[in-house]
């Protein structure tokens, strides 16, 4: 009970509002004290105690930090003094409750007022954004400006008393409000600073904007004061004077705070909703600038301090809100808002005197500023009483981040006929089909054909629209003239009869022919020919003159009918029926409704078709018109199945991929009792299969065209056939009329790689059919290679052990788990359970053969070591001995090689001796000849010079020819030496000729 009372009392402390605190705040002020009762088993008591601690902590936080709890998020660490203060507060007030708790707890906590940290002023302030937030001081100054418009310029002391008005402080956390500044000419900051948090950034921008606006405001105020003083001196009228004078505001913040607290305790005023940027821009447009202020002189410019207080206290907030909603801002109202500066606080007081009464001027201006400009230290509350969000920042979002609405989504325009016509003319479909790199179906060409037809029709339509001859109302299609029936139409009518029951039609034709033969015999045997003859119909060859004697013809017909009745001796009961029938339909009645050909059926479909069939009979005399069915339907209905949609058996029911579907042979699943009864019948009737085989073998002979037999190279061992494969072979042969190639492809399992043992050929199927099918005993082979196939078949059957054995549809040796109902339709891919067994058996046989082949070689190898084991093995040499033997062997090899080289060199020298002698003799002879030649030439030159009286010229020095250096190793034959000598002799002769 105590815990519940504590909970209710704490909720009452916060004015009935529901408070909640996050775990982050609770973690900052953790309690390390010990519990009084450590062994607390009740969980509800624990929960209520924790709730009480959190509420108490929240109360202390609101009292300690009245400016808001956002300071806890922005601050890095808490001071130990604050934490210890909280511990003391908790120990003191955790058991107290009631009204005394509220007063004593509030007085015990000393609040901490946050002082904004103003950054240093940059050197150059340029271009601050125009949409800067308004300060709270602008609201306060606007109120003073309105007050001073009614009173003369008061002293600084009186202004200081009424300049700062603060609203009531609340326990709830304050919210930083978006502020807007009305100054039109703002400067931007030269270098943007980067604060640590968003709140600090907002404070920084506000302070910079305030400083720039204050400097501009002071300059404007000084200009206005100077201008007004000059005009006052010139005019000299003290009655009509408007003075704007800068007023200094006291900088003592302590006194102003005390005044604010007293005023807040007395009166509380509701706050207005936040001001948006658009509303501020409208205010700026409507409020004239300072340069455009018109000076209006009032007769009385002195107001006492009591009047100012009366005006301030006489403002009704509710009335002002109504006036603000109904009344716009006056166009001639002029308000100059100047923020309070930090270093040199100077404010401007604008005195606006108008011809209107003071109350009418004061109320709208003050109402607007109070309603539009909220305070900074209190949370903004809308007119509906809803509290504004914690942070209200003016951020210009880019257009890309705004989600598009459903109306802004681009709607894909429908393709018009003109656009489609243009596209098809630029790139028609039939040209693309001609150049297609893939196969093109007939459906694609039909689509291109239809596109061309539509394109041509649209083209004609556009041409008709251009000429003005096109109307949206199309004329009705004109019916064509019906045509007369031709022989083809009569044949089609007869085909309708034949389509109903062709076999009965054939019987009826035979009977009709038999009757006609009897009529001919009756004609020849009759004594009176007139009784059996019928007059020929002359309707087609009728002439105009015969129309006059039509009554004679009618009388002749009546007499003829009477003769027929008397000739056939009809009974009285039948006379009425026969005489009532016309002569033209008499033959039809006797032929169709005879007992021999009339067929009754229970099929409703056939009975309905008979009603639509035209009456059988010869063509009438009148020309019948044929109804053209092609006008209604795309094709001429030859039969009643022309417009029926053909359905394949595969589409009627979805058969399994590995099963052959047969709609007629499929039976419903059997129950357990039916299976048991069927198995008992098979056991009792063991000779049933043999009887069936005998019935099949009793069939007469029939011809079969065998496949071409394989060559001797293509013969391979026969693959095993399973009982299911035999059943499937017989089924496919009956279904596809002994198409051996197609049946072999169906029996071969699908896949890219098919082993040779599993691949079935046409000849394999033919051989297996001869062995399995009992009807193969009466078969007669036909075709060009029938004799060759018979020879191959005899050779293959001669080697087989079971030539005369005819397997049944199910072998007795087939395992029971493979005998299933409807296994007649199983494909070979389903029943491949025997393949691994056959492969393992083949591997086992091969391994046995290898084992038998290895046994004699193993005995021989075992005998050889036994004989060698009796002999003594030589001792194993050591490494030193092996190296010595190797060096001795290498020395012997080198010695033998040197002897061979020396003998070869001697033999070469002996062969070169006569050759060297011959070469030396030839060189000596050449030198002698050269010397003789030089001597003769010198003598000739000297004789010529002496005869001409010219001094002799010294002969030229001819270089001496050196013999060829022939190595001793060169071997020259005598013929080569002779050729060399001749070449040397020819050299001087050529020089002489030159």
UniProtKB/Swiss-Prot annotation:
PROSITE patterns: HSA (PS51204), MYB_LIKE (PS50090). Keywords: Activator, Chromatin regulator, Coiled coil, DNA damage, DNA repair, Nucleus, Phosphoprotein, Transcription, Transcription regulation. Its main location: nucleus. GO terms for cellular component: NuA4 histone acetyltransferase complex; nucleus. Residues 880-912 form a coiled coil. It comes from the Eukaryota. Residues 713-773 form the Myb-like domain. One of its GO terms (molecular function) is chromatin binding. It is found in: Nucleus. The modification Phosphoserine is found at residues 298, 378. Residues 475-548 form the HSA domain. Residues 158-171, 178-191, 204-233, 254-265, 288-305, 672-693 have a biased composition (Basic and acidic residues). Residues 122-275, 288-308, 671-693, 857-880, 975-994 are annotated as: Disordered. GO terms for biological process: DNA repair; DNA repair-dependent chromatin remodeling. Component of the NuA4 histone acetyltransferase complex which is involved in transcriptional activation of selected genes principally by acetylation of nucleosomal histone H4 and H2A. The NuA4 complex is also involved in DNA repair. Component of the NuA4 histone acetyltransferase complex. Belongs to the EAF1 family. This is Chromatin modification-related protein vid21. It comes from Schizosaccharomyces pombe (strain 972 / ATCC 24843). The lineage of its organism: Eukaryota, Fungi, Dikarya, Ascomycota, Taphrinomycotina.
